[in-house]
């Protein structure tokens, strides 16, 4: 294949590309069995070393880009993932994420920029085999929770099936409407050295990854638009439409306008993004257990004191956690009474409870026989040979070859890679197998093909696999054309399907004219019409939006005050003998009052300015980027991001681009630089970018979010937080009388922190007085930064809440604050008492500050109260609030 002119100009033609790739492949072949699967079928080049026709365009594109281009491509993909907020939460094997672990942090999704390209001919084989396998598993599921003929006829051993954790006794008798009992199926496959495909695992409990697959397509298509246009891979988005129609069709027969929800374990789930992104694509609300309740045998969703009927649940919570009454009692992820509602036929849950039994590794041993019995067909996709310890001859083979097999327990889910075990471990395992042979299966080690990856700007080779998806339709099963590809971890970890990155799967179109037309089952209209989608307004969702408003406002205000304090520090650190320099310790004290953390400086006559100079840089550093420092800027940003992820389906896509930039800006895990100038540059950038990001998010919320009850609650949080911050700041800066020069410097800094210095100068022509400041910052209803403006907006927001009577307790409390404020006068607030304090001003500010806290507490205990026994996602008393 001749290199293109542009590729040659780049000095990185196809021949050089292949030479580097062959070197990487040669290194793979050096691995023996103990090290990993080694090199098998090569997706990219044939046995003669020539690029396969399916990959020709990609090879040209990579050669044309060269190393620099591949580096840029990696950077672009990383940036797009960052901007879209695509995350993955790695779960420690020793933790139970489903019962809640608040120490888990989502990390960025890892996506290889180079797609895994599949020819049209290969896809025809995969699609036919995948659909057949879904039909087979559907028939098995219907039989196991129905007539059980495969058990009574002795085809399947009951001891192997019923001991598997995927079997749910409470699911017996539950029947989904329609022809199919298996709603959604995911299948992990790889290619064998002879080019055929092999199934390594089936996922039927709550299949994950379809959201990631469609997000990957969006990222890669944006990263390489020219290549995407040239190859024209078949789209994945029709699968989302097929899934949406199937969910509507799955509703109970009595439902006329079905309401569908996606039930998530929450943001600490391993695949929280996958769930939220899929819910957004489908246009269905993402809910958690706290949002749902069973009443009168029906499932309802909470909505500010009212209930809305739910007809279909797309379940992403494992079955045993779905109902703490009938299943796992300690679950905080399920809905009490959900099993009973299913038995009554008032709600459809998909995948149905009990579908996890199809993930039993022992079942693989019997699939060929089951296919012949239930479908009268031979399997089109084969599985690696499996030996069940419950059959004497197979037990002997298992024990004799335990060191070269993948050993799995059908009871605990434990998986052991035989080649990695020591002699003692192998002996111990043999004893365990002989003691309870029916609990164990041995599987021949899976084999994988290799494909190109972008490794550090160089075309490399790595083992790859695929996860493919189907969804039930009235006339059969519809596959996602493409799926979630993955790059396998090196070494023996690959045998357990451990991955290091994802890959987009590009299926080449056929040459037939109708190649891009989706099959009839996908586009068939549902028997029912789904209800219009609506925003979730349950207490949990509203609480997260409320805290989004608070944390966003807190971060904005904190960034401004930190900027002002840092700038004044640099102005006056060499002018300590001037009266104006007193503004620095006053501002530092204000930071301490607002965050509730000692800033190691005082604002009274006893402070030591030399100590202030020594402490201020480290204090400003920790208040900006130290996540363990109470009230720090990074803490507010983290709180905002956490709340946003909990309501991802409610927010604009632009939110994640802004949040990603802000999170990066305040992420600084190392110690501060020794150089004051370098440290100041880091702080200046972090503070400025955070401020810009918060202003952008405020604009996005105001202009891109529907102003429904969720937006109203977010604005309530914003108004309360701005009022709390303003009263705390003014109390710290203006309640004590100081030298006129110091007072002017303090007033100027305070106005800048309040984003009101320009309007103040325009109104007062440069004259500084506390009376004028209070007039502007407390009483001016046209100033969006004033206290009265916050109270008026807060009153209007409370009135807009559903069920507002006009005289609820929060509304009365706001009215009382408004009355108290309007009875005060700027001139009186400026008056100084005998002890040198502006006592009336301090009393007013302290009183309103306390009242605003009370309003927040009342809202938390009423409109935002979670059901009994539930906790906010931070856990009990974990939200970070400003001190009283």
Curated annotation (Swiss-Prot):
- State the protein's name: Uncharacterized protein Mb2597
Q: Which organism is it from?
A: Mycobacterium bovis (strain ATCC BAA-935 / AF2122/97)
Q: Name one Pfam family in it.
A: Alpha-E
Origin: domain of life: Bacteria
Q: Show the Gene3D superfamilies listed in the entry.
A: 3.30.1490.270, 3.40.50.11290
**Record-linked InterPro entries:** ATP-dep_Glu-Cys_Ligase-2, CP_ATPgrasp, DUF403
Q: Which residues form a coiled coil?
A: none
